[in-house]
């Protein structure tokens, strides 16, 4: 199972057995059974979740996210790419009539050195986009043109936590993308919600999701703007801020630069936040560990001249399990801090 890149080898099994359709069926069924145990695959309020989280589900190099009756599959290694058709057949067997579409989206995730000329394609069905439900809220999911698999299911529990703190607050959601945090804060009773993203398409999408859940609600406004410039120029005193940027460090070589970026970003936000504010801040960079991220946030508070206290230490949800032999699978870390 050869991988061209920084990972020398990915291990599928420690026993001598054929890697065939039966093997894939067993692994996918184990992953599905766990999501049933987590009350995700059989939930009345959520139908967007991660079915396969690479090494965490003993399927290294494979990601599968479920959106209602569609599976979006990403291969991160040539081995999983070559097995895609067997995987699709096994997945349909496991999920049965709960699955109508399988979209294979690996153009940008396969190692470029592998020289695999792969176009994204349907392995089953062919629906272009759909809506998915998360904790009773509805979101447009466009796996054809959207980032990653179309939606960030890893923030589900953290969005629900934000909802609890939203009542009566002025919320700023930076790097909003689909606007998940914005939609939850609207339901939580925020007085005002502003969503910011550098992408005009993201702004269009967050507005679409707000209208889908809260038609005609004037509390929300979205802006297409550079994050640092927006923070420099903003005059509204937001007392609940979400900073969920894209990965600042995808490789260890970029670690120092990434930590400086997190410090700068969080310091700019803290400088403008009134006393008694709450900051949700995240890093999805594998190369940045929890201690390094926390140190960057403490440094940001010092630069901003603010005193902060940690209210919550956040991470990825249970449908993103971590293999004890693959600690890198724990990539999402976050802090909720009280700013004084």
What are these regions (language model features)?
Residues 224, 238-268:
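Mobile active-site "lid"/loop adjacent to the S-adenosyl-L-methionine
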